[in-house]
Amino acid sequence: MYDDLVEFLQESVTPFHAAATAESWLCAAGFTRLEEADYWNLEPGKGYYTTRNGSSVVAWRVPQHAIGGWRIVASHSDSPSWKIKADTVENDGCRRLSVEGYGGMIMSTWLDRPLTVGGRALVKTEDGIESRLVYLDRDLLVIPSLAIHFQRDINKGHTYNPQVDMQPLWGPAGSRTLTDLVAESLGVEAADILDSDLQLVTRQAPTQIGPDGEFFMAPRIDDLECAATTLLGFLDASGETDSACAPVWAMFDNEEVGSSSRMGAASSYLRDVLDRILEAVPHSAQASHRAMANSFMLSADNAHATHPNFPQKSDPCAPVRLGGGVVLKYNASQKYTTNAVSGAIFRAICQKADVPVQVFTNRADEAGGSTLGNLQSHTLPIPMADIGCAQFAMHSAVETASVADAEAMTKAVAAFYRVHLRALGDGTYTLE
C-alpha cells in the first residue's frame, strides 16, 4: 500500500496531475471515462468516471439492482503553492518569476530548496485547442533567503511579504524564458502556447523516517494522502460493495481557497453527477429523495496531530498521535460535519474492520480550520462524517505523517464501501 501512496504523491505534482494519476488508476481497474457533455448510457455492474477542469474527478460503480442509496468518499486534489502570474522578468542581473500565493502555506518552508514548475498549458492545434500536462522534471528554481548579516533579528520572527520575499530566482539575465522551456518540453512552438495554469512544485521525493520507517515525509500530504488512500479503498472494495447502494469516489479542486469554483466541493458537480446517474438507470419518481435518505458520506481531509514540541496548541482532552489510527473530527460550529449519528456509524464500521479511530477537536480558544464536508452539505443533505490521517506541519512545503495511518485509512474506506448500511428511521441504522 505504501508504494502505491508514494507513486500517487510523486506523480501528482499539481491538481491536474493528481486527476490524471487517479484516472490512470481507474482505467487500470476497468473504469470507463464519460464526458459531461455526452449522453450517458450506464450498465449495471460497470464502473465509470468523469472529470471537470482536468483537476476534479468523480468515479462510481453502477449496482446490479436499483440504486437505493449512495456511499460517497470525497477528498481534494490541491495543496498550498505559488501560482505563476507571468513569465520571467529581469532586474539586477537576474531573471525571476512573478508568483502569488495559493492557499495558506507556511511561507518560510519554501525558501532555499529546489523547486520546479508544473501544471497545464493550452496549446493551439490544427483542430483547435488542446490541454497538455506540464512538468519540468528537474531542479530549476529557488527562492533564496536574505543572509542573516542583513537581518540580524531574523530568528526572532519575520513577517514575509510575498511580493518581496517569495519571488523565485529563475536564472541570469538573458537566459531562456519559462515559455521557452515549457514549449520545448511539449514539443511545440512557444507561439502555440495560448495560456497556462502553472505553479511552483517542491522537488523533494517522499521518504520514510523513524527507526523502522514508521513515518514518512513528502510534499502535498494534505490532502493527497487521503486522495490516494480513499481511492485505494474504493478500488479494493469494487465488486464487493452493498448491492443496493452505488459506491462513489470524488476528488475536488480548490479546497485550499474555499471550494467555490465550478470544480470545487461547494459547486453542484457531485450532485450533477448523482442526478445524471439516476437519470441513466431505471428509477421511480421518488428515487432521488429515497436514495439521499439512505446515503452516507465521508469527507476525507488530513488532521493535525498533537505536536510534541507544542502540545499546548492541541486540546488535552483529545490528543491525536501519528500511528493512532483514522482521525474522526468534530466541531461545535459545524466546520466539520460529524455528529453523534455519523460518528457512531463510522466508529461501528471501523470496529467491524478492526481499524483504530482517534478523535480531533480544537481547543475552545482556537477557531481552527474547515474542509469540504460542510460545503458539500449545501447540495447533498445526507449524513456525513469528517475524517483524515494525522500529520505534522500541515501546509508546509514538506509535511510528515504515519505509514500505519495511511494503511488504516485504506482499510477503513474499503470497509465503508463494503458495509450494508440501512436507515430504518431518523437516527436508526442497521449494519451488516
Question: Language model features by range: what are they?
Answer:
Residues 1-432:
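N-terminal hydrophobic/helix-forming segments and targeting peptides
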